[in-house]
Amino acid sequence: IQPGQLTDIGGSYAIKSLSEAVRALKEKQIDALVTAPIHKKNVQSEEFPYTGHTPYLKAAFEAKDVVMFMVAENIRVALVTEHLPVAEVAQHITRESIVSKLKLVNQSLKKDFGIDKPKIAVLGLNPHAGDEGLIGKEEEEIIKPAIKEAKQNDVFCFGPYSSDAFFARGQYEKFDAVLAMYHDQGLIPFKSLAIGEGVNY
């Protein structure tokens, strides 16, 4: 294996390492799983058709749903969609997916972080969170109803917020977590603020 070089054997060992770690976790030989980055181009194959760890773990544990949850000391960001082309994001933003992710984040904040009543911010999909329907309909037709439904399920969530102003004004500091609609919307500010200290929880 040559560090920094894509090789078939490197990709093969990355998959085998992850597979063995999952097996050990299922058999209760270990209590937790910590992963290192994998190079998607080097591991994707018929054997591993996943876009990253999160969908692989969902399949491996036959989970109904999972959430990509990025955590640092000063900020926590979860995603509704993960590794998708931007052109496909809107079609994957559904009321059901938003509610499901909110429930998962809420559960994690309570169980894993010991927060009794977590406050979760929800970002809009479109610029300025749609400007009340002037720039896209997703906020009015999907995101707001999802927030309302999540609240009825005892999830203390608010939004949708315009992502640029939300992070620029430090509003994220008032919440225990943020739910972003897509990868770059959430991870660009997260990585900028976490400065190398964040992990995919």
Pin down the residues of each PLM region.
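Anion-binding alpha/beta catalytic cores of soluble intermediary-metabolism enzymes, centered on
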Residues: 1-138, 143-201
